Amino acid sequence: MPWPTHPYLRTPEGWLYLAVIIDLFSRYVVGWAVSPIIDRHLVLKALEMALKHRGHADGRMFHSDRGSQYASEDHRDALVASGIACSMSRRGNCHDNAVSESWFSTLKFELGDTFVSHAEAERLLFEYIEVDFNQKRMHSTLDYVSPAEFERNAAEKLSKAEAA
């Protein structure tokens, strides 16, 4: 299942950039990172978190826009080393990354896009992603359960099928 990714958050200290990796199967945010600099280190940090959550990812696909941070040699090499295929949106077509774009739109609607400080933004993002979104947010595409519950249910079904 593809992992789409990315927004820009404003603070008096300057911009803060957020890279997010969403598992399209469950809508679970498996990796994320923030930084005052949008570069390959930001997306590599998010990828590292995703791999810690999911382990080696043979057969998985990573989908992003065509930003230089995603096109960097370091990022492409990290994907290859992890068994992940790289997919990039067509130039100028935001619909190719619709899940990610929708996620960021919801985030900005619910949290806003201006924060008092980088520290406040990071704290609120942690709470939003790890506590609210992954654990509590119900999704119509998941039969109105949270990403965490959807994954638990899927694992239970798989376990029962393997035992049969």
Where in this protein do the model-derived segments appear?
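Charged DNA-binding/catalytic regions of mobile-element recombinases
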Residues: 1-164
